[in-house]
């Protein structure tokens, strides 16, 4: 997928708040959250500050009004609360090092985390949806504890290189994209295909892997509808939130 510079398509601060708020609520609905941990962010112009959830809030409690703005040093420049340590170091490093990464989603969802915990932790191309991730995933095979230092965030950014998705061994996943809609769409399908791959492996049968040449042929077909599909998907789930969680507007 073509890389874009996030700041060329940077929405307003209010628009950023709305989008990142919605993604937190939806992550809770889909069971991607991990108590008060895990973190999503949106960069502000220049990449020196970003919107993030205040530490201690559940994803189901996030509203636009209780998001905080944090700078590269962890100082809160708007809002009330603190930033979780790994949220600061992971997101600050990637926002600064990847100008295309307007939105970053870092989570430990069940099936992607299962894959990250396997000796062979690489996603196999076993069905049509897995091809969405053909040659798009970086695999970080270093786990040395919590990401609570600046150099660990920088190491993660380097390991991610130019990929939008990175699976962290024994840990979880980070998704980075120029828009919230694209990041959410990627995460939705990544967790889905990891679940499907888990079912294939658990069945005891041998996975039938799609040949690389077929994957390369199919990728452009998926790219044609990628941006529209990402936008329509987010719009559809926003309608669900409006019907069933009206307090999310706060």
Residues covered by each model-derived region:
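Glycine-rich flexible loops
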Residues: 16-17, 21-250
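Single conserved hydrophobic/aromatic residue that forms the stacking wall/gate
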Residues: 1-15, 20
